[in-house]
Amino acid sequence: MLCACATPSQHFSDEAKTLGFASGNLDGEGFRHVVYFAQIDRAADALHVYVEHDGTPWIGVARVSDDPTPRTPFALELMARDHGPRLFLGRPCYFEGRRDSGCSARMWTQRRYAPEVVASMAAALQAFLAKHPYGNVVLIGYSGGGTLAWLLASRVPQTTAVVTIAANLDTQAWTTLHDYSPMNGSLDPVREPALPKSISHVAYVGDRDTNVPPTIVRSFAANHPEAKVIEIATFDHTCCWIERWPELLNAALASRSR
């Protein structure tokens, strides 16, 4: 039984172990990254890399969280329903890393999508790929993790596809919608250059999502028409992505050849 005093980071680690994932750490650029993985030595050409949601940057409207690590794993659960080689790539300052050198609350609030966050995650992933040279990388991110996955794509040469789920790809529109603090210092995908034509992007969104409504994703797609937006009826921000993930992942990957 999980101790009631366990931190979110400890809880997340315990959940990863329960799901059967091995764990490790990778050095990025100035930050340490917790990773979880499975089937890494299996013969396959593609590696699926998962990025988790923003977790709990704030407690209420004014208090910054001491530990932003997600209380409810979501991308981790998606990864558990995938069956090929797969890697969960942790963010800087999450998953017991919040006390590392270079970490401050800004790294999980205003600067959660900052250039140094993306650069460090890309460096950590490249360090992993140097030891496990997969020719194709598929980046998969849920909610704010989808935003980071998209930002990572052009910085990881092995990337062939990005799949985002309920991702706030127009962060300015998203913060305005919810009256959140501006993401000063963060990158905003809607204002970034298009991905290389060699990288496909499927952007899933639920038609009942009130956190990241379809208008946010379509606002992004208006500036990035190369993105294939797929709106799923009756889905919201959490239902029912995990249950339908194998089917949705297969559909997203199949769309690359169409």
Task: Specify the residue positions occupied by each region the protein language model found.
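N-terminal cap/lid segment of alpha/beta-hydrolase-fold proteins
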Residues: 9-40
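Short, surface-exposed "cap/lid" segments of acyl-processing enzymes
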Residues: 32, 39-97
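Alpha/beta-hydrolase active-site loop
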Residues: 103-131
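Primarily recognizes the serine-hydrolase "nucleophile elbow" in alpha/beta-hydrolase
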Residues: 134-182
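Post-His helix in hydrolase/transferase enzymes
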Residues: 240-253
